[in-house]
Amino acid sequence: FDEHFVGQMIYDYTSGYPFLVSRICQIMDEGGLTWDREGVLAAVNHLLKEHNTLFDDMEKKVSQFPSLAETLKAIIFGGKRVSFNYYDRDLNIAIMFNFVKEYQGATLIYCRIFETWLYNLFISNAKDTSIYQQGEYDKPRFVHRLAT
């Protein structure tokens, strides 16, 4: 297999977040998945659907800090450019929990997996609202669809 390609693809989805990298590799190894594009996508899909302590903790933090949730929603759903500023209370919390990172002065969701997971969380919490219908319409523009 092309270990550089697979490693880069895993990095593209995880931004090197240690638990995510390890878990994807574990899913691929224990699940007998191929070490190629399809195997990585299958492992990422599996990871996004599973119950784990990382996602439990993320959900708790989003619930505990409603203004943080609103900031994350603005970035994910609206594509809002938020300046990276440690003194912004919500961003400071998001930085502390590794929800976001800085890139060229802007705030980005830390990695594709977090972006997709948060998107799914917010959509599931709002499925009976107009934001749900708009999010489903806009999803292809903002969230990378994974092959199933």
Residue spans for each PLM region:
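Minor-groove-contacting beta-hairpin "wing" of winged helix-turn-helix DNA-binding domains
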Residues: 106-111
